[in-house]
Design a protein with these regions (language model features):
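A short helix/loop element that forms part of the nucleotide-sugar donor recognition site in Leloir-type
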Residues: 99-116, 267
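Nucleotide-sugar-dependent
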Residues: 133, 183-190, 197-220, 227-238
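Carbohydrate-associated surface elements
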Residues: 71, 89-92
Length: 297
């Protein structure tokens, strides 16, 4: 059984009762509290009430509750889950996707070669160009640094892309490059052409339960240091010493983080990047995660 919006727990409970199977409920999204806090819906809204009853039911009746969010435990206990029912799982990477290294398109290769020939320090962002990832702060931080040796390469699309291009053009410096999205199979090769990778997010109260971003594991696997700007209690960048972690939505903090990575020696950056890659290989391949998951029960 999986979360959002929890109503399938009732059917799952009946099936398990008849078959004698164990009921394992996975929580990925925090419903209905997200509706209350971010959607500003009322506690006794009929839909919210319906989902809350379902959440209380799986907390009480599931044999185990599994979540990607390690800090959701106390919340779920308050809704009827026994302490010993909670298990934590994780997202990760498909190792086979990183074994093949397809070449990147010629126009992308041309841009990156040009930046490398000019001695640029390349910050990469690979993903959707939306407000969720706090990209305006990254652009403003680089502009404030006013350093011609730093370039940011954005690869992807999204509803904020034109706004970001406009912001990037406000200062007369050619630090920012916006490229179209590429197939997922090319992401590993492209990521490894950067000097560091940006992973950020705007503040979100729901992050207090923890966060598990696929983008972070891909970035760690690239072997490049990470500029990490996410406000969540679990922080793999700090845990595995694979980059620099800064306050999110802060131009000043991002400036400091960029400067710290830029002024490091290549050996220091290489060590950070390899720390992240090794952590993924040891803990976050889906083969390893599947074995760990099976051992939980």
């Amino acid at each position: 059984d999986a979360s959002t919006p929890h109503l399938d727990t009732y059917a799952a409970q009946r099936i398990c009762k008849k078959s004698g199977a164990k009921l394992i409920h996975e929580v990925r999204d925090m419903w209905p509290i997200t509706l209350l806090e971010l959607g500003h819906m009322k506690k006794y809204n009929p839909f919210v009430f319906l989902i809350q009853c379902a959440e209380n039911s799986f907390c009480k009746h599931a044999d185990y509750v599994v979540s990607l969010l390690p800090y959701a435990k106390e919340y779920l206990i308050k809704h009827g889950m026994r302490d010993d029912k909670f298990r934590v799982s994780s997202n990760g990477i498909v190792l086979e996707e990183w074994k093949e290294q397809p070449s990147i398109p010629k126009e992308y290769d041309k841009v990156l070669k040009h930046l490398r020939e000019e001695g640029k320090f390349i910050i990469g962002f690979l993903g959707s160009h939306t407000k969720s990832y706090a990209l305006t702060y990254l652009i403003q931080a680089v502009q404030e640094l006013d350093c011609l040796e730093i370039a940011v390469v954005f690869v992807g699309k999204g509803n904020q892309k034109e706004e970001l291009k406009e912001l990037a053009s406000k200062k007369k410096c050619n630090n920012f490059y916006f490229l179209d999205p590429v197939p997922k199979s090319i992401i590993p090769t492209l990521a490894q052409r950067m000097d560091c990778l940006y992973v950020g997010a705007i503040h979100n109260d729901m992050f207090r339960f923890g966060i598990c971003m696929n983008k972070l594991f891909d970035s760690m696997m690239s072997g490049k240091p990470i500029l990490y700007a996410v406000d969540a209690p679990n922080n793999y960048v700090m845990d595995y010493h694979c980059g620099v972690s800064v306050e999110p939505e802060s131009v000043e903090a991002l400036e400091q983080g960029i400067r710290q990575l830029y002024t490091m020696s290549e050996n220091e950056r290489e060590e950070l990047g390899q720390n992240g890659r090794q952590a993924v290989l040891e803990h976050f391949t889906y083969e390893k995660l599947a074995a760990d998951f099976a051992a939980l029960f």
